[in-house]
Swiss-Prot record:
It comes from Cronobacter sakazakii (strain ATCC BAA-894) (Enterobacter sakazakii). Belongs to the RbfA family. PROSITE patterns: RBFA. This is Ribosome-binding factor A. The lineage of its organism: Bacteria, Pseudomonadati, Pseudomonadota, Gammaproteobacteria, Enterobacterales. One of several proteins that assist in the late maturation steps of the functional core of the 30S ribosomal subunit. Associates with free 30S ribosomal subunits (but not with 30S subunits that are part of 70S ribosomes or polysomes). Required for efficient processing of 16S rRNA. May interact with the 5'-terminal helix region of 16S rRNA. Its main location: cytoplasm.
Length: 133
């Protein structure tokens, strides 16, 4: 019988918490900003590599997002060393940072649904206005 959560999933979950704390408290690079969220971590089966998915709140500019990812990638060695001190792992995974646009895309979809519902409400309240157009 297989375990519900394997070791890579448990390590990824703990890494997500620790990296979020490190980004909040230790990273002082202005390109990263204060509003960086770690939305997920995927760890390889051998725990040698980790993909870290981050979002930058209040950053709608694509250049700022790219600069933030580059800053995180440049600081990945430092983050990895702090991660090694925080977690007791024999091998600390090599970190690669990716921008996770699912939060932004979800907000966009939510706004679209809200506007469609609002438009339907207006049409239901004023059915004559739709026929005149």
């Amino acid at each position: 019988m297989a375990k519900e959560f394997g070791r890579p999933q448990r390590v990824a979950q703990e890494m997500q918490k620790e990296i979020a704390i490190i980004l909040q408290r230790e990273i002082k690079d202005p390109r990263v900003g204060l509003m960086t969220t770690v939305s997920g971590v995927e760890v390889s089966r051998d725990l040698a590599y980790a993909k870290v998915f981050v979002t930058f709140l209040n950053d709608k500019d694509e250049a700022a997002v790219k600069a933030g990812i580059k800053a995180l990638q440049d600081a990945s060695g430092f983050i990895r060393s702090l991660l090694g001190k925080a977690m007791r792992l024999r091998i600390v995974p090599e970190l690669t940072f990716f921008y996770d646009n699912s939060l932004v895309e979800g907000m966009r979809m939510s706004n679209l649904v809200t506007s469609v519902v609002k438009h339907d409400e207006e049409r239901r309240v004023n059915p004559d206005d739709d026929k005149e157009e």
